[in-house]
């Protein structure tokens, strides 16, 4: 709610909350991945193409995903060219890890806002909480600051 209120106060029309909705009961993600999101902090995220290489799905240069750091990322970070040389074997290993719920190897896609996630509620509850907190904060801000026409 705080992030939504802040963004709206700065003139945004909305916010991106993908990680928050990934850690909900209805999301199709693996339960172990959701638990990692709850336990994570924003400084444990990295941005790059390592997991795109492992998934055989490399995006154009300006695009890269943010994921939670894990053993795979620590092993290959800064060695993307070498990973490309081993892509077939690492992709196979990655696929097995993802199927098995092994998130020491498979990616957990998560943004820096992961710090604010502490539970895995129903999605409707996330929306209700977010709207309630944003509404309260926005109402409080309008009461706190009076604009003078002078």
Residue ranges and their predicted role:
Residues 2-150:
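Conserved active-site-proximal phosphate/metal-binding subdomains
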């Amino acid at each position: 709610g705080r992030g939504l209120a802040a963004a709206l106060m700065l003139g945004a029309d909305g916010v991106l909350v993908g990680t928050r909705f990934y850690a909900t009961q209805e999301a199709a993600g693996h339960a172990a991945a959701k638990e990692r999101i709850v336990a994570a902090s924003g400084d444990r995220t990295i941005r790059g193409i390592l997991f795109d290489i492992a998934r055989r799905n490399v995006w154009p240069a300006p695009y890269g995903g943010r994921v939670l750091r894990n053993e795979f990322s620590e092993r290959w970070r800064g060695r993307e060219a070498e990973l490309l040389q081993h892509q077939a074997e690492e992709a196979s290993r990655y696929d097995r890890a993802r199927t098995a719920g092994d998130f020491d190897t498979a990616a957990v896609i998560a943004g820096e806002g992961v710090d604010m996630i502490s539970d895995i509620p129903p999605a409707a509850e996330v929306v209700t909480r977010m709207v309630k907190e944003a509404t309260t904060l926005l109402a409080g801000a309008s009461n706190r600051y009076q604009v003078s026409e002078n």
